[in-house]
Amino acid sequence: NNNARLMFGDGTQLVVKP
């Protein structure tokens, strides 16, 4: 998909949809 995904060390996932 076109989403930008960042995975943090604590396991939290941030998904950014433009």
Curated annotation (Swiss-Prot):
* Gene Ontology BP annotations: adaptive immune response
List the subcellular locations.
Cell membrane
Cellular component, GO annotation: plasma membrane
Organism domain of life? Eukaryota
Mind listing the UniProt keywords for this protein, alphabetically? Answer: Adaptive immunity, Cell membrane, Immunity, Membrane
The subunit field of the Swiss-Prot or TrEMBL record says:
Alpha-beta TR is a heterodimer composed of an alpha and beta chain; disulfide-linked. The alpha-beta TR is associated with the transmembrane signaling CD3 coreceptor proteins to form the TR-CD3 (TcR or TCR). The assembly of alpha-beta TR heterodimers with CD3 occurs in the endoplasmic reticulum where a single alpha-beta TR heterodimer associates with one CD3D-CD3E heterodimer, one CD3G-CD3E heterodimer and one CD247 homodimer forming a stable octameric structure. CD3D-CD3E and CD3G-CD3E heterodimers preferentially associate with TR alpha and TR beta chains, respectively.
The record's function comment reads: J region of the variable domain of T cell receptor (TR) beta chain that participates in the antigen recognition. Alpha-beta T cell receptors are antigen specific receptors which are essential to the immune response and are present on the cell surface of T lymphocytes. Recognize peptide-major histocompatibility (MH) (pMH) complexes that are displayed by antigen presenting cells (APC), a prerequisite for efficient T cell adaptive immunity against pathogens.
Q: Any idea what this protein is called?
A: T cell receptor alpha joining 31
Source organism: Homo sapiens
